[in-house]
Amino acid sequence: MAVPKFKPSKSRSRTRRSINMRKKIPQFQECSNCGNLVVRHRICLKCGYYRNNQYLEISL
């Protein structure tokens, strides 16, 4: 059975675990069609466009 040769330091352990402590904040960008703020890689709910292609028919 494998056994660690040295005790891992607190800073090494905490650095490894720190990735899980970061806040998950959604990234926003401007819609290329209407200029509305949209979460990245999602269809704009105001105009229905994503990457200059219309995917939703929005009735006003």
Swiss-Prot record:
Q: What are the entry keywords?
A: Ribonucleoprotein, Ribosomal protein
Which superkingdom does the taxonomy of this entry point to? Bacteria
In the record, biological process GO terms are: translation
Q: By its UniProt entry, which InterPro entries does this protein fall under?
A: Ribosomal_bL32 (IPR002677), Ribosomal_bL32_bact (IPR044957), Ribosomal_zn-bd (IPR011332)
Listed GO MF terms: structural constituent of ribosome
The cellular component terms of Gene Ontology attached to this UniProt record, alphabetical and capped at eight, are: large ribosomal subunit
**Family membership noted in the UniProt record:** Belongs to the bacterial ribosomal protein bL32 family.
The name of this protein is Large ribosomal subunit protein bL32
Recite the lineage of the species. Bacteria, Pseudomonadati, Spirochaetota, Spirochaetia, Spirochaetales
